[in-house]
A protein has these predicted regions:
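A short aromatic-anchored loop/beta-hairpin motif
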Residues: 20-210, 214-218
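Sec-dependent signal peptide recognition
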Residues: 3-11
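Hydrophobic h-region of N-terminal signal peptides that target proteins for export
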Residues: 11-20
Length: 218
């Protein structure tokens, strides 16, 4: 039975390519040789942006600051439990938010995937903090790609592309996330025996099937 599950998982992952990263949200796992300090050992979520490029944030760089420490005079910020995360090198002084909601939380929010939006505008983020503060994760800065730029980075082998998953976006403990996903991707590549298309998109369903102890708990 396990062998059958593995074969089915491999068929699933071999049917998909990194070209899908152009059309929907994905997780990006930095290659070990990616030495840029901004992205070394990072996991990102990225999705198409209205300008034809892509936009996203780094998921595994928590800071030591709380939202309340950044906005001490803003009482609703004290309700936010999680730390503020470092989202990327674009607009480092700006606050953005990944918001878990079944509809757009306000003006200018970019849909990332089902029930997930990236909010940029201050009035939208204020509304989220005041109404559903712990249904979001807050970041200083973000990552942006020009049209075609992300595909170029994937083709150069800078990223392993995996299915986006809300359980990673809002995972409480992000320490070890990069190593976990990297090891899982290597295990899948080993199972595929060199028959995968290049570049390969690895589906989390296949990762879970091949890795019994793979953790995605929040």
């Amino acid at each position: 039975m396990i062998g059958l599950v593995r074969r089915l998982a491999l068929l699933l992952l071999l049917a998909a390519s990194a070209a899908a990263a152009q059309d929907e949200a994905v997780l990006l796992v930095a290659h070990p040789a990616f030495r840029d300090l901004e992205y070394r050992q990072t996991v990102l979520i990225a999705a198409p942006a209205p300008n034809g490029g892509h936009v996203g944030v780094i998921l595994n760089r928590p800071t030591r600051r709380s939202l309340a420490s950044l906005f001490p005079d803003h009482a609703p910020s004290k309700k936010v439990i999680d730390p503020v995360y470092y989202g990327g090198p674009f607009s480092r002084a700006a606050l953005v938010a990944l918001v878990h909601a079944d509809h757009a939380p306000g003006d200018g929010a970019v849909p990332i995937m089902k029930d997930l939006y990236l909010a940029f505008r201050a009035n939208t983020i204020d509304h989220v903090i005041e109404s559903t503060p712990n249904e979001a994760r807050y970041y200083v800065g973000y990552v942006g790609w020009r049209p075609g730029e992300l595909r170029g980075e994937i083709d150069r082998g800078l990223w392993t592309v995996m299915d986006a998953d809300l359980s990673f976006v809002f995972r409480k403990d992000t320490e070890g996330m990069w190593e976990e996903l990297l090891q899982a991707s290597r295990r899948i590549r080993a199972e595929s025996s060199g028959s995968e298309p290049e570049p390969l998109r690895l589906r989390l369903a296949a990762v879970r099937a091949l890795t019994p102890n793979f953790a995605v708990a929040r």
